[in-house]
């Protein structure tokens, strides 16, 4: 009888564990009403062919092969995600190739993030990237007007970081001459395009040209980190107006010349995997 009494708590504990296991939600719905199937339990990033995983961008549901996700397993627990291709070919990484991420694989990565904008107008979200909404508007590193306008390059209008002007401004703010913010690699050159109304509809911010070098070397068609040169990268931002979505892409600055192909891939990754609602 005593043994049976001792078993009762153990049985109750086992029952609670079983209930906890069966109560894990298999779907997740975001604020905009998009419901996606969650990936429950261990995931195999090496699975080939890769299974489809669901992701939401605002109200839009996408179904994407899992090897295209940054972690090659699907969304994060909260539904956030980014997608990846590799430069220069803009092809997918092989299933599992990004596990134990190596420096060269990381450097080849072109990462795509999609942000649904509904709290403010999409155009305003774009403006916030190049018109200061906080801090000192006189800081020449934070405005188009504080930069050096250059001749068009790759179909883009460049606004280079004016490092002497920036350093003079920072010195007036009390910064030491050897402070990190005084160094070229702290700052970015901006490249823009404008729409018919003159509004900036694309912004690409890259490590300052004053850093020099590309930071990359090619062997057998693959790109590797050039350890004797500094590394430069770009952050590329544009809009999908009809879907109220801001797209942000990161890649090595050497890839700036291919920005149009990279942007076309960003669009394809979204629209080719869009399930609902169709627009």
What are these regions (language model features)?
Residues 169-230:
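Catalytic cores of processing enzymes, dominated by hydrolases/peptidases
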Residues 14-16:
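Bacterial signal peptide processing site
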Residues 213-279:
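Long, compositionally biased interface segments
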Residues 52, 59, 201, 242-244:
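Sequence-level motif detector for i,i+2 pairs with an aromatic at +2
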Residues 2-10:
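Bacterial N-terminal signal peptides
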Residues 6-7, 27, 199, 227:
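Residue-level signal for mature regions of secreted extracellular proteins and peptides
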Residues 18-193:
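N-terminal export/ancillary region detector
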Residues 11, 32-33, 54, 204, ...:
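Extracellular secreted precursors and ectodomains with disulfide-bonded cysteine-rich loops/domains
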């Amino acid at each position: 009888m005593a043994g049976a009494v001792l078993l009762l708590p153990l049985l109750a504990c086992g029952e609670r564990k079983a209930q906890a296991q069966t109560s894990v939600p298999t779907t997740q719905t975001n604020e905009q009403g998009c419901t996606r199937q969650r990936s429950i339990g261990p995931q195999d990033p090496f699975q080939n062919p890769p299974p489809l995983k669901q992701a939401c961008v605002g109200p839009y549901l996408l179904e994407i092969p899992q090897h295209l996700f940054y972690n090659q397993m699907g969304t994060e627990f909260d539904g956030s995600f980014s997608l990846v291709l590799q430069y220069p070919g803009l092809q997918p990484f092989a299933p599992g190739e990004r596990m134990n991420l190596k420096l060269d694989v990381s450097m080849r990565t072109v990462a795509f993030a999609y942000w649904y904008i509904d709290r403010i107008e999409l155009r305003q979200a774009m403006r916030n990237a190049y018109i200061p909404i906080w801090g000192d508007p006189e800081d020449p590193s934070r405005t188009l007007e504080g930069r050096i306008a250059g001749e068009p390059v790759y179909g883009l209008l460049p606004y280079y970081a004016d490092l002497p002007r920036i350093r003079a401004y920072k010195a007036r703010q009390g910064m030491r001459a050897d402070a990190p913010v005084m160094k070229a690699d702290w700052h970015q050159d901006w490249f823009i395009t404008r729409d018919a109304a003159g509004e900036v509809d694309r912004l690409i911010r890259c490590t300052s040209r004053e850093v020099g070098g590309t930071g990359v070397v090619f062997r057998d068609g693959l790109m590797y980190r050039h350890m004797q040169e500094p590394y430069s990268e770009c952050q590329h931002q544009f809009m999908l107006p009809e879907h109220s979505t801001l797209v942000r892409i990161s890649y090595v600055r050497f890839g700036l010349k291919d920005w149009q192909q990279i942007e076309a891939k960003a669009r394809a990754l979204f629209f080719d995997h869009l399930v609902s609602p169709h627009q």
